Amino acid sequence: LHPRVRRQRQMCIRDRYRWTLWRLQPALGICKRTSRGACTDGRQMNIYKLDNIKLSPTSDERELVKIAARALGHKPLYFRILKKSLDARKKQDIHWVFSIEYGDEFPPVCAPLEKLRSHRKVYVVGSGPAGLLCAVRLADRGFTPIVVERGERVDDRAESVQKFFGGGELDENSNVQFGEGGAGTFSDGKLNTQTHSGFNAEVYRTFVRFGAPEDTLYLNKPHIGSDVLKNVVKNMREYIISCGGQVRFGTLFSGFASRGGKLFAVRLKTLDNGFETEEAADDLVIATGHSARDTFAMLTESGIAAEAREFAVGVRIEHAQDCINRAQYGNVKGLPAADYKAVSTVSDRRVFTFCMCPVSYTHLTLPTNSRV
């Protein structure tokens, strides 16, 4: 070991729970710091973090454990990848960049959320990502949410969509935009976002909890994949039901009733037979996405305030994948399909690339027969 590394490791041995700043650039080309937490018995513990670890495209990720072991002096009991991204700025030095966390003890585990055991009837309209995540959190807290979805279960919905792509008729209530899983079900389950929110990590953890790949937690541009996403969505639905909730498909939210400004009922329409019922409700969450125009019209006509949201108008640009790979990677092989990001300002307005879909298809997506 580099003498500086050896000395600083000895400092930790002498005072295991000391707040220490490590600098390992001379030895490993990386920076390291510790974060301190508390064990359940009140002892202090150190969890170490290594940033800016560079590995070649052909390296095995198990090399990261060896790097942690060298810094710690022995194989760590706890190890986790925090972040993984590809640095292709220099064609002669393309490499993966990692951040890892490790230690001799596992970090403290957050206590489960308290079960409130509420008897309030909560309706969630829509089973896209917003609706499902909302219902899962409600179930976690002891509620028994009722999810209302006009479309079909994800497997039945996939069949309807494939029939439409093959020239069949459009089902206006179950298509690329309506149905279990939301519109993202057929766009490879990409989870990259330009919104910097503290809730992003919790969303990723929830997806992994229900079956998404573990690398969703640390990839720079994570995506679940449409096939895996279908199972994740089904697992969420089964969990909601196991907690006493309901998920009703083929059911349209057609209205609500209030008294003195307070909600007391929702009106639901069964699409198979057109039968409409009114059910008592204490709370209502609208998670319909952006395509349920009839729902938005009903809400505004009922006096619910609404305001237009800014949106971007986009065009599709197609490139040969080999051209993008050569531009980004040069002649380096064995890397994932390359993408890029471009931003400019035209007449004081931003123009930017947003969604990269290597080896993708363009399909007409329309919620009704009269509108694209």
Question: What is each model feature region?
Answer:
Residues 1-15, 363-372:
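Single conserved hydrophobic/aromatic residue that forms the stacking wall/gate
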Residues 19-22:
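Tryptophan (W) side chains
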Residues 46-186, 190-210, 214-364, 370-371:
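Residues forming the flavin
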